[in-house]
Regions:
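Transmembrane alpha-helical segments
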Residues: 1-2, 16-23, 98-105, 157-172
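Intrinsically disordered, polar/acidic, low-complexity terminal segments
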Residues: 33, 172-173
Length: 173
């Protein structure tokens, strides 16, 4: 579904990202310009609702009765899965690339006027967004997901890892 992502992992993470951008823009930064995101957010929410309510989902769910966890348990277990997969997703190559990027990031950030005031909040938000990647599979299947799902979660993790590297470097300057 174009308006809400192609599967529940990306749809859920996309929705949370869009809501976060809207919140930061309007509430935190007090910018009325952020309200231009409201129509897109509403379309996304409607699309996500249609995606969740699609008839094929209930048909498919009948094949997996008793496999998944409750919604709250799925959310809690998502954080455990997130911690469990950190070593697998953070290999030596990823760490080497992060170290190699440090001088470039540091230099680029010298020219910005943006103030990086909330590194802890960004780190916490990042982990929560990353963990949401496990929630749909835990809810429907009772495990972290198939390899294609884990690949999508890993990509999210890597993007957020580098976002945090940039943000923390900005905060340290």
């Amino acid at each position: 579904m174009i308006t809400a992502g192609s599967k529940f992992v990306t749809a859920l993470q996309g929705l949370l990202s869009l809501l976060t951008i809207l919140f930061i823009s309007v509430v935190v930064e007090h910018r009325k310009k952020g309200l231009w995101l409201l129509p897109a957010t509403l379309v996304y929410i409607i699309g996500f609702g249609l995606n969740v309510a699609a008839p094929g989902n209930s048909v498919r769910a009948r094949s997996y009765v008793g496999w998944g966890y409750s919604p709250l348990e799925s959310i809690g277990r998502s954080f455990l899965e997130g911690v469990k997969h950190l070593p697998e997703f953070t290999g030596s190559i990823v760490l080497m690339v992060m170290v190699m990027l440090l001088p470039l990031i540091w230099q680029a950030l010298k020219e910005t006027e943006y103030r990086f005031r909330y590194p802890g909040v960004v780190l916490l938000w990042s982990f929560c967004l990353y963990a949401t990647g496990y929630t749909p599979s835990l809810y429907s299947l009772g495990h972290a997901g198939l390899s294609r799902t884990l690949n999508a979660v890993k990509i999210t993790y890597l993007l957020l890892l580098f976002l945090n590297e940039i943000y923390w470097c900005g905060w340290l300057q």
